[in-house]
Amino acid sequence: MVLIAVLWIVMALSIIVTGLSRSVRDEAKMLSMARQGAQASALGDAAIQLVLQQMAVDAKPVDRMTTVQVPYQGRQMDVQVMPLNGLVDLNSAKTPLLARLLTVAGGLPESAAEPLAQAIVDYRERRTAQGAPRRFEASEDLMRVPGVNYDLYARLSGLVTADIRSGGAVNPLAAPSAVLQVLAGGNAQLAQQIDSQRQSGQAGVDMTGLDATLIGSGTVRRYRLQARVPVPDGGSFLVTRYVDINPRSRDGLPWTTFHMQREVEPALRPSP
């Protein structure tokens, strides 16, 4: 009986030791990931600041999506600069553009997309107590429109903005590939072709396949800058700043950041 009791005690102690060892390993891994995230965030912010400084020196508005390679402290990072008129402006987009967005990107049938697009227009045009149109203050406000649930918003969130006044049209040179697909009526091959021509720096990009009633040109002073910082596990850490390139005497900088976000882009794992 004594021997059996000793064996049970030894087994219990080994289980406790194993659990403690696993807990220590997990905590060490979490600390390592937190340290990597903090370092990647600082590197991404530094790369964005360098690109912003160059944009301020050039004093020339960027009219198309472009990617800048930034070497910093022995790391090579890509910073994507996107003028916000490459997104669908919730406060000025016409009903046909919103309906196309809901159909192509949102996955809704046309019979549901058209009335929902009109509901979005009705929401932003509704008058406040002061008599001004209510308008969308942030893209998240889209979920206040009846019929827009979180799943639909998640499919649209990266394609819309409430931070500019674009006149209702989209600049295809600045548009992400998913927005190009909306402008192309769902033609993914055409959107990819235009995106490839644009990324190659081609001067005259053929836009004839896009719906001419939905596109426009021009420049804005608001941009999304996104730095991609590679991390040791093969993934990337994305640092994003939404900025207004205008002098501000309050802080002395020639730009103002009005939104920031950070996220992890996991490494692609081969399928088993």
Give the location of each predicted region.
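Compositionally biased linear targeting/interaction segments
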Residues: M1-P272
